[in-house]
């Protein structure tokens, strides 16, 4: 890359010297320094013996002095600006080529924190745009934990009862649907209360389960519509 830049500079320097060049025979010993303007210092003139270095030395001498600008400098300015922009572009590309592998190595070496940062990026953006919503997001796990804790507190007496007296806990489990029914529909709860002795008998003697299941439709019909229940008894007696 450096060789290409140097070659480009040499070509630009030679192209700038073609217009004002003076041809000397190969056997001639005429100093190249005689081509330089007379207002340049003698030290600069003695150094500029190489034709390839003449434009570069001339530019340095003019930049260091306060003399009026020569037409040669105006010819070289666009070329120099082009070279400078090219050099800056090449440097930026080289820097990018050097930095990107380092970033990739860091990301591969520390992938877990990088992925965590990517996961938390929406929350960071949310905290910047809407702090109130971000605070709610932060409090969400605590709200869920509070809900679970309240449920545990409600179930704590039943858990203690199950540990101390399993039979009483079983009765509580049997009566739990009735409690929920009482909260939802009071009329149905009263009906279930009338049927409660049958359920208690079932809890005491599981052998009566089949009889209770067979009689349950008739009992419910008797509680809801006594006239229809009486007709069912008449029809049942006629059949048997």
UniProtKB/Swiss-Prot annotation:
GO terms for molecular function: nutrient reservoir activity. Keywords: Repeat, Seed storage protein, Signal, Storage protein. Residues 1-21 form the signal peptide. InterPro entries: Maize_Zein_Storage (IPR052508), Zein (IPR002530). Zeins are major seed storage proteins. The alpha zeins of 19 kDa and 22 kDa account for 70% of the total zein fraction. They are encoded by a large multigene family. Structurally, 22K and 19K zeins are composed of nine adjacent, topologically antiparallel helices clustered within a distorted cylinder. Belongs to the zein family. PANTHER family: ZEIN-ALPHA 19C2, ZEIN-ALPHA A20-RELATED. This is Zein-alpha 19C1. The lineage of its organism: Eukaryota, Viridiplantae, Streptophyta, Embryophyta, Tracheophyta.
